[in-house]
């Protein structure tokens, strides 16, 4: 009997309320768009993607962005990647990204992979967050960055695939380090 999937990755969507985390979740898992669903607390959906023909199962957790529902350490426990989302039409949501990064630093595994996502890039005339500034900020933290649109399905798949590939690379690097044992010094003491 063969395995159903090559890897299982838990991803958490984090960011302020109203930035479109739920819309991203529905777009990536069901290829649908909704503006009316309200997340209370936390929920998750499953998505299988294929990398080099191998099935990779994603467990994607959607979190409410309100302070009273803020993600805590139990939500980050065991996660492989965090998608930090801000709204390109809401400067404050971008200014709060460092606070979300601090929560991740505090509660998640130190090796968790992060990506910063600017959602709603289809609203060109309402854009207030400069994408070059956002890219510069992400680069300064060595975190990948993408602008997307959950509504128009722009760059969503690409963002998730890049996160999956980073997770696979991390696993392969870790595995390689474990198999390479340091050279032993042959020392004879008389």
UniProtKB/Swiss-Prot annotation:
| Membrane topology reported for the UniProt record | Lipid-anchor
Enumerate the SUPFAM superfamilies for this protein.
Answer: P-loop containing nucleoside triphosphate hydrolases
**GO molecular function terms attached to this record:** GTP binding; GTPase activity
Subcellular location(s): the record lists: Cell membrane
What does the similarity note say?
Answer: Belongs to the small GTPase superfamily. Rab family.
Q: Lipid attachment of type S-geranylgeranyl cysteine occurs at which residues?
A: 187
- The domain of life is Eukaryota
Gene Ontology process terms (BP)? intracellular protein transport
Q: Where does GTP bind?
A: 15-22, 62-66, 119-122
* Residues bearing PTM Cysteine methyl ester: 187
The gene from which this protein is expressed is rabF1-1
Keyword set for this entry? Answer: Cell membrane, GTP-binding, Lipoprotein, Membrane, Methylation, Nucleotide-binding, Prenylation
Please give an example of a GO cellular component term from this record: plasma membrane
So where does this one cross the membrane? Answer: none
Spell out the PROSITE patterns in the cross-references: RAB
Q: Which residues form the propeptide?
A: 188-190
Q: Motif Effector region: which residue numbers? A: 37-44
For this entry, the protein name equals Ras-related protein RabF1
